[in-house]
A protein has these predicted regions:
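FMN-binding flavodoxin-like domain, especially the glycine-rich phosphate-binding loop
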Residues: 3, 8-183
Length: 183
């Protein structure tokens, strides 16, 4: 279930701003965030995708993303972005590149995590154009005590893909990123 979807407001409608290149940045200890991120990218329909998986280690060097759209997906622990994710994202920057902020939470609440990720995007040179929160199996889930067991499931993934499609349609309405009011 998509619990919250935010899109940038348009400043004006012109022709088309399309992206053939996308970058996925994710921290996904339970693989839920990665699954959601890949599905959002499928919905965006970009040609080439590169990935920075922060689950096991941070990049050896700072990373600056100059082109394409970046989908950033992180889990929520206790209503906040996982501290380890923030530490590993520290050397990642955008150069006025559009970003989609996505948080995945364990069916409790994501509190201000989506806002926190949006603020991180702005502080690191990205222009957040859309954001969403999705449910993934809670890290405390056990077979005898499932918490959002099996999530994201097919309906969740369909919604993630539809979200990516919506973001793609939004961006196709503009020629430049300057025309999009960030979220």
């Amino acid at each position: 279930m998509v619990t919250n979807v935010i899109f940038a407001k348009e400043k004006s409608t012109l022709y088309s701003m399309t992206y053939d290149y996308a970058h996925l940045i994710c921290f996904s200890p339970t693989h839920s965030s990665h699954m959601i991120g890949e599905t959002v990218l499928q919905g965006l329909g970009t040609g080439h995708v590169s990935e920075t998986d922060l689950t096991y280690e941070k990049p050896e060097e700072n990373l600056t993303i100059h082109s394409g759209i970046t989908v950033i997906v992180v889990p929520v622990y206790g209503g906040r972005i996982a501290e380890t994710a923030l530490e590993r994202m520290e050397g990642i920057y955008g150069q006025d590149s559009p970003a989609v902020a996505v948080v995945v939470y364990g069916n409790r609440d994501y509190d201000d995590a989506l806002l926190e990720l949006r603020d991180w995007c702005v502080a690191h040179g990205f222009v957040p154009v859309a954001g969403a929160a999705f449910i993934g199996e809670h890290s405390y889930s056990r077979p005898n005590r499932p918490i959002a067991g099996g999530r994201p499931d097919n309906p969740d993934l369909q919604k993630a893909r539809a979200f990516g499609e919506q973001v793609g349609r939004l961006l196709n309405r503009f020629q430049t990123l300057d025309e999009v009011a960030p979220i």
